[in-house]
Amino acid sequence: VNSNDCKKTIPLIDSSGKKVMPHMMITNMSELRAIVSHCQDYTTLMRYMDLHEIGKFVKFAHKKRMINSEPLTMTEYFTSVKDVSMIKLKTYYLEILQQLTEVQVTEMKEYFEENEEFYIGYDNVEENSQTNQTNKNAGMFITTKDAYTLTDGPTIFITKSPTTIGKFCVQQSNIPASTLDGLMETITFNTKIGKKVEKLEKSIEDKMTRNETNKDDGKSEKGSKQKESNEVKQLERELEALTSLLKTVKLDSKFMPNTLHHLNKWIVSETLRKSIDKSPSQPFKATIEESHVKSIMELANVEPLWKLLLIMGIGMFSKDVAPEYLEIMKTLAEKQHLYLIIASDDYIYGTNYQFCHGYVSKDLSNMTQEKLIQALGRVGRNNIQQNYSIRFRCPLYKKLFVKEEDKIEAVNMNRLFVSM
């Protein structure tokens, strides 16, 4: 299938691990036609229609003789193999849906409800074990058993409560209490040293600035200069001694998502293990350099939780964190060195980094359609088709496919212009 680079497939996944498609989320024919019409008006939405699911639907529609128009027969619509492209297949899918009768819609709905497949959450089980297919947290265990599903590049988790998600990531990692206590003790120790380092650096900076000012004004005498120079040197020696006290913070790689040790621990299915080995899409892992870890550990105004998460390859974008921390996170995000970024919804409009997967948190259920589209746009910004996905923790995806009559953003903009 030929594919234009800007026409991607980014499947939407619900909280149970199933793909979201227009023909699988409707209740009647009028609802279906409204959704199709909206998608035809806003063709950008086609990027969220999964090609594999489209193929299954088209095959079903032809098998059940649901093509009610001659121009929509396969031979008429696709005149040659060269005519088959990703965008044309998606357009074809919408046109078939648009011409279905009420009886056909009912038949289609019943068939796909009975034959729904899970995209994530049910292949990582031991052979011959019984699985309960009512899991409402499929794909949520991003630091343990579901990490392997996050492939090709970094993931963004958009939420109103980054700290809550951060704590969940640590909790689910199953780091032994003794190990966790030791790590937090070291991080706390380094933070205390960091505060002292910060004060010393400020003292050195102030003295050097004062020396330069006196020098420019001609007020500094030779003896005074020497004294101030000695004081600066003494402070620098104290700074060096303090810095040498900083302890190295290391975490066993089995607690770092998608390292070999981690995958060996959490992938229990031998069939899945072999499938991953053969797949061109490999589980993505962080590549955090020691210098970045050291820089974060030295920051006095960063919560221990976020220092611990960085070691795991997880960063945070939020207005609540120190600017110095945020700058390091931006550098790591730009170079795609982080496994996961937990971002507050305030960062939806200002995050231009490349992500292959995204999560939309439960606490964003009231997000507007426009803001949702902006949020989803964070994923799949690469110029190539990779293995992408957007995973919803609430049914917010329904808002994506429905025409929104009163856009809050447009109303606010109109008010702004009227008031000027």
Over which residues does each language-model region extend?
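Conserved C-terminal RecA-like helicase domain
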Residues: 14-343, 355, 364-388, 392-396, ...
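The feature captures the ABC ATPase H-loop/switch
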Residues: 346-347
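A short acidic, often aromatic-flanked loop/helix-cap motif at beta-alpha or helix-coil junctions
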Residues: 5-8, 322-324, 398-399
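Conserved helicase ATPase motor motifs in RecA-like P-loop NTPase domains
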Residues: 1-7, 157
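Long, hydrophobic alpha-helical segments
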Residues: 401-420
